[in-house]
Amino acid sequence: MSLGLLCCAAFSLLWAGPVNAGVTQTPKFHILKTGQSMTLQCAQDMNHGYMSWYRQDPGMGLRLIYYSAAAGTTDKEVPNGYNVSRLNTEDFPLRLVSAAPSQTSVYLCASSY
C-alpha cells in the first residue's frame, strides 16, 4: 500500500467521529465490598428482542449469566447471586444480590435481533 493511500485512509477515519454503539452499560466500573449489592444498568435503543448479560473472569472467555428473548421473559445460566428484570424492550438491569469474591469479574451486556 502506498504512503499516500495510507494517509488518505487514516485521514478519512479521523472524520468519522464517535459512533453510538446502541447499547449503554452503567456504571462503567464499580468496586464493592463483600456482602454489598448493586445494580448494573443495560439499555439499548435498537429495538432488539434479545438481551444478554455475560461475565468474563481473568484469563477466561465470556460466560453467559442471563438472557432475555423479549420483554417480560428471562432465563438464567448462572443460578446464584444474580437477579434480572426485563420490563420493557430497552432495559435489562442485572442485580448482584450480595457481592462475593467469586463474582469479581468484568460484566458485559449485549443485544441482538
UniProtKB/Swiss-Prot annotation:
Matching SUPFAM superfamilies: Immunoglobulin
Record InterPro entries: Ig-like_dom (IPR007110), Ig-like_dom_sf (IPR036179), Ig-like_fold (IPR013783), Ig_V-set (IPR013106), TCR_beta_variable (IPR050413)
Pfam families named among the record's database cross-references: V-set
GO CC, alphabetical: plasma membrane; T cell receptor complex
Residues carrying sugar: 83
SS bond list: 42-109
Compartments (UniProt record): Cell membrane
GO biological process: adaptive immune response; cell surface receptor signaling pathway
Signal peptide: 1-21
Superkingdom of the organism of origin: Eukaryota
Major subcellular site: membrane
Quaternary assembly: Alpha-beta TR is a heterodimer composed of an alpha and beta chain; disulfide-linked. The alpha-beta TR is associated with the transmembrane signaling CD3 coreceptor proteins to form the TR-CD3 (TcR or TCR). The assembly of alpha-beta TR heterodimers with CD3 occurs in the endoplasmic reticulum where a single alpha-beta TR heterodimer associates with one CD3D-CD3E heterodimer, one CD3G-CD3E heterodimer and one CD247 homodimer forming a stable octameric structure. CD3D-CD3E and CD3G-CD3E heterodimers preferentially associate with TR alpha and TR beta chains, respectively.
Function statement: V region of the variable domain of T cell receptor (TR) beta chain that participates in the antigen recognition. Alpha-beta T cell receptors are antigen specific receptors which are essential to the immune response and are present on the cell surface of T lymphocytes. Recognize peptide-major histocompatibility (MH) (pMH) complexes that are displayed by antigen presenting cells (APC), a prerequisite for efficient T cell adaptive immunity against pathogens.
Name assigned to this protein: T cell receptor beta variable 6-8
Source species of the chain: Homo sapiens (Human)
